[in-house]
């Protein structure tokens, strides 16, 4: 179950990052958030 949830999180975060890449002014902040989430796990 945890692996499945983790895969879903990766897919959703990937989709969000692709949308964020369109708005490059926000990409830096969101990358920091993603890095913090990965390091917390």
UniProtKB/Swiss-Prot annotation:
Keywords: Cell inner membrane, Cell membrane, Membrane, Toxin-antitoxin system, Transmembrane. It is a single-pass membrane protein. The chain crosses the membrane at residues 1-17. Putative toxic component of a potential type I toxin-antitoxin (TA) system. Neutralized by sRNA antitoxin TimR which binds to the 5' UTR of timP mRNA and inhibits translation. The antitoxin gene is encoded immediately upstream and transcribed divergently from the toxin gene; antitoxin RNA is less stable than timP mRNA. NCBIfam families: toxic_TimP. Belongs to the TimP toxin family. This is Putative toxic protein TimP. The gene is timP.
